[in-house]
């Protein structure tokens, strides 16, 4: 580990890997540090991503694809199902990834591009020069290093502290912080080409339950609930245990994962002098699903490119780096996040009776594409009463 680099990337997930690769491909000296001993472990993700989204960055490889999906099934509180199948999606529903292998592949590509990779290396504090973030104190194997960088890219997830260190408000309201639990469950009867989404205030208050196939008779079975709904006997794991006992009583649990994800609005600003914030660290996970792989990869790649352009011009000020914030915020990603936040706020607090009514009304729907916008418009057409209850939501579509 050297004393100085052009770019320091904190975090070895998909966002950090794409940032490091993009910067290294421009000939910059790049250091990526990951606090955990191994890239991709432990997994803290349901591991789903759309096929078109993935194809923007990497060709699919069977070694890190756990399931190739052709349908998504939405299940209401009373068990009523609405299936969005292959005929409506052009075969583009998505994949369930093996994140341990996938993340390592992305970091390996960054290394091949010229980035230096250091694991079990924790960025514990910023190096501040003239009030600007100018590097980080790194702890690794009992040693402490002070690493300076011209640009720091914070890709260290929902727990990230770099934005706070730079004076950016990173507070997430408890109601918008989903507490999550997930089991890998084996020996269960599932459709191995379908992702299942269970919506019920009773079973998952202000959240949902997912069943994502991971191979033969195996699936990620998880839940996210609002932090304000968690309490003794009502924690995410408690709800999940009750669901599994009901739906998969003979399943064999082989792994437990717990964590949290923000479903709030993005940070007001995702850059500062010498600093770019990407992915979950910037609160860019999807407000409806909590998914963040694509958003992290997109903003990570963009951050690496913007950092390289700024360094070539010799200006890494906040003003110079604002092109990053403006690009994602004013583009398709920013618009989708704003719309999905409005959808989340409108639907998440509905009681089970209204959820059942909506799912029942969807039985005759036909969708030309799988998007949040097309689905919500179809729901409004089938449920005109929603226009009276949710007039503001219509304005976002």
Swiss-Prot record:
Binds 1 FAD per subunit. It comes from the Archaea. It is an enzyme of class 1 (oxidoreductase). Its cofactor is FAD. The keyword Lipid metabolism applies. FAD binds at residues 15, 34, 45-46, 48, 99, 123, 280, 292-293. A 2,3-bis-O-(geranylgeranyl)-sn-glycerol 1-phospholipid binds at residue 372. PANTHER family: DIGERANYLGERANYLGLYCEROPHOSPHOLIPID REDUCTASE (PTHR42685:SF18), GERANYLGERANYL DIPHOSPHATE REDUCTASE (PTHR42685). Belongs to the geranylgeranyl reductase family. DGGGPL reductase subfamily. Reduction reaction proceeds via syn addition of hydrogen for double bonds. This is Digeranylgeranylglycerophospholipid reductase.
């Amino acid at each position: 580990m050297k004393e100085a680099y052009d770019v320091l990337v904190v975090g070895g997930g998909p966002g950090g890997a794409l940032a490091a690769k993009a910067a290294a491909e421009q000939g910059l000296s790049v250091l990526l540090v990951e606090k955990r001993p191994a890239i991709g472990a432990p997994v803290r993700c349901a591991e789903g991503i759309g096929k078109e989204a993935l194809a923007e960055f990497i060709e699919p490889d069977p070694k890190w694809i756990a399931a190739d999906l052709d349908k998504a099934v939405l299940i209401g509180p009373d068990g009523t199902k609405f299936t969005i199948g292959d005929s409506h999606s052009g075969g583009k529903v998505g994949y369930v990834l093996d994140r341990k292998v996938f993340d390592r592949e992305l970091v390996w590509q960054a290394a091949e591009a010229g980035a230096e990779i250091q694991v079990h290396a924790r960025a514990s504090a910023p190096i501040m020069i003239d009030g600007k973030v100018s590097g980080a104190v790194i702890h690794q194997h009992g040693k402490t290093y002070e690493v300076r960088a011209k640009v720091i890219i914070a890709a260290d997830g929902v727990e990230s502290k770099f934005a706070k260190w730079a004076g950016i408000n990173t507070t997430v309201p408890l109601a918008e912080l989903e507490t999550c639990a997930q089991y890998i469950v084996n020996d269960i009867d599932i459709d191995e080409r379908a992702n299942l989404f269970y919506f019920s205030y009773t079973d998952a208050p202000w959240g949902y339950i997912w069943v994502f196939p991971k191979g033969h008779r195996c699936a990620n079975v998880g839940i996210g609930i609002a932090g304000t709904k968690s309490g003794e006997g009502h924690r995410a794991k408690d709800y999940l245990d009750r669901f599994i006992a009901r739906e998969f009583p003979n399943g064999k649990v082989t792994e437990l994962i717990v964590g949290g994800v923000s479903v709030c609005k993005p940070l007001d600003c995702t850059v500062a002098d010498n600093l770019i914030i990407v992915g979950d660290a910037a609160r860019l996970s999807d407000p409806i699903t909590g998914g963040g792989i694509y958003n992290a990869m997109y903003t990570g790649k963009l951050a690496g490119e913007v950092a390289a352009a700024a360094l070539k011009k010799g200006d890494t000020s906040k003003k110079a780096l604002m092109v990053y914030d403006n690009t994602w915020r004013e583009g398709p990603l920013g618009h989708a996040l704003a719309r999905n936040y409005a959808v989340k706020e409108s639907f998440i607090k509905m009681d089970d009776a209204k959820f059942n009514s909506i799912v029942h009304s969807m039985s005759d729907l036909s969708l030309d594409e799988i998007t949040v916008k097309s689905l919500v418009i179809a729901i409004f057409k089938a449920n005109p009463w929603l226009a009276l209850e949710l007039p503001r939501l219509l304005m976002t579509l």
